């Protein structure tokens, strides 16, 4: 978490502190909720000025060399220094060095595989786990909880420490990294606990458009039109190709995507609504998303902001962390924004076979017991068309993009 260079980290108890709107580092306005406004670029500059070259280096730290005979002779001087600091005898200092040395931090049997559970264990939890693992191996099944845990771990660790093949793509020392959580769309009612469905890492030097292009939303993949008379007709466009307008909202400013001629200013309606009756929201500003990087922003950690696309598909965006890059991070700039977490969604199955993911949704369907009703491609064609492809009965058919597509 981001920390105050003069005090504790962001996780500890904080108290309201008078601050201007362009502070250099996060101060917590409301404990456990969000910080006061601070400038992302100033935060990075502040830490780069406080830390040394060794702290900012992205090179792998060299392993400590084993002590030689000459170095071992320095133990007496170290014992004397410890004895002086603690006010104890040299014998007690030497005993402390032996008892509290680094060698004592090693566990017994470190060479053993921790995944192998011994047969003669007396620990009940290990016996239960061994039984579950044996059952999975015999039945070739993995329960959903274990599958999701493995999936989440792979998502978070697949790029750790990865370096670029091209040295020009190497992240610069002292680069800022922000953790951005994108929540489910506001109109998505399945998960009312408002959990994020994507967590990505972005660099402070990246433009807002790079985050915008990396966000995967099922609304962008929708296919317009009714296809009951021509189910084999290939759609010309998806929604993302037709409606390219979008905006981010951060601290009183709407950052509109204006990269394409067909892009509209989606924030204009909101601004006009706010100013029409002096609703007390102050003066909103507009800017071009492609002209700003995250280092240019003033933000609050933990505060809900907004990403809007497709006209009315709105996502709450929460920036939860800001820090400097570490040598263990992914150092390939081309992989950012880097997806680290993604919520696992249940897929909607075909109403007929109950096996395959739905590809079609029908309305006013004389063959369906529900309205709307979902079908996989095979069952849809088998039920609604004859062997020559002619339409049977009356119904309206629309291509369906399941949210589980992103699993």
Curated annotation (Swiss-Prot):
Gene: Snapc3
GO CC annotations, alphabetized: nucleus; snRNA-activating protein complex
Coiled-coil features, chain-numbered ranges: none
Keywords (A to Z) from UniProt: DNA-binding, Nucleus, Transcription, Transcription regulation
GO molecular function terms attached to this record: bent DNA binding; RNA polymerase III type 3 promoter sequence-specific DNA binding
Range of residues in the leader sequence: none
Subunit: Part of the SNAPc complex composed of 5 subunits: SNAPC1, SNAPC2, SNAPC3, SNAPC4 and SNAPC5. SNAPC3 interacts with SNAPC1.
Pfam families: SNAPC3 (PF12251)
Function: Part of the SNAPc complex required for the transcription of both RNA polymerase II and III small-nuclear RNA genes. Binds to the proximal sequence element (PSE), a non-TATA-box basal promoter element common to these 2 types of genes. Recruits TBP and BRF2 to the U6 snRNA TATA box.
Record protein name field: snRNA-activating protein complex subunit 3
GO process annotations (BP): snRNA transcription by RNA polymerase II; snRNA transcription by RNA polymerase III
Native source organism of the sequence: Rattus norvegicus
């Amino acid at each position: 978490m981001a920390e105050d260079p003069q005090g504790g980290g962001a996780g500890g108890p904080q108290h309201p502190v008078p601050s201007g709107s362009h502070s250099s580092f996060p101060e917590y306005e409301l404990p456990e909720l969000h910080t006061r406004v601070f400038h992302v670029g100033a935060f990075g500059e502040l830490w780069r000025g406080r830390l040394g070259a060794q702290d900012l280096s992205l090179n792998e730290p060299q392993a400590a060399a084993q002590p030689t005979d000459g170095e071992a002779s320095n133990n007496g001087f170290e014992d004397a220094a410890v004895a002086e600091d603690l006010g104890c005898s040299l014998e007690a200092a030497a005993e402390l060095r032996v008892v509290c040395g680094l060698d004592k931090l090693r566990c017994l049997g470190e060479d053993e595989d921790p995944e192998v559970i011994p047969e003669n264990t007396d620990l009940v939890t290990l016996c239960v786990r061994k039984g579950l693992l044996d059952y999975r191996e015999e039945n070739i099944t993995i329960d959903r909880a274990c599958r999701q845990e493995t999936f989440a771990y792979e998502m978070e660790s697949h790029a750790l420490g990865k370096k670029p093949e091209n040295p020009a793509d190497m992240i610069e020392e002292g680069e800022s990294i922000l953790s951005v959580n994108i929540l489910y769309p506001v109109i998505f009612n399945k998960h009312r606990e408002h959990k994020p469905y994507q967590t990505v890492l972005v660099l402070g030097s990246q433009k807002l458009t790079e985050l915008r292009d990396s966000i995967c939303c099922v609304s962008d993949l929708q296919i317009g039109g009714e296809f009951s008379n021509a189910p084999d007709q290939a759609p010309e466009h998806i929604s993302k190709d037709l409606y390219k307008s979008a905006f981010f909202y951060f601290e009183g400013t709407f950052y509109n995507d204006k990269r394409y001629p067909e892009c509209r200013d989606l924030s204009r309606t909101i601004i006009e609504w706010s100013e029409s009756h002096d609703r007390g929201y102050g003066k909103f500003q507009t800017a071009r998303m492609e002209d700003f990087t995250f280092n240019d922003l003033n933000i609050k950690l933990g505060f809900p902001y907004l990403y809007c696309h497709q006209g009315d598909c709105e996502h709450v965006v929460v920036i939860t962390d800001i820090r400097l890059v570490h040598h263990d991070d992914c150092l390939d700039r081309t992989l950012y924004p880097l997806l680290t977490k993604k919520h696992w969604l249940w897929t909607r199955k075909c109403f007929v076979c109950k096996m395959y993911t739905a590809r079609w949704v029908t309305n006013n369907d004389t063959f369906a017991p529900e309205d709307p009703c979902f079908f996989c491609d095979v069952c849809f064609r088998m039920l609604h068309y004859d062997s020559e492809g002619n339409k049977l009965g009356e119904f309206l058919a629309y291509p369906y993009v399941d949210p589980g597509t992103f699993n």
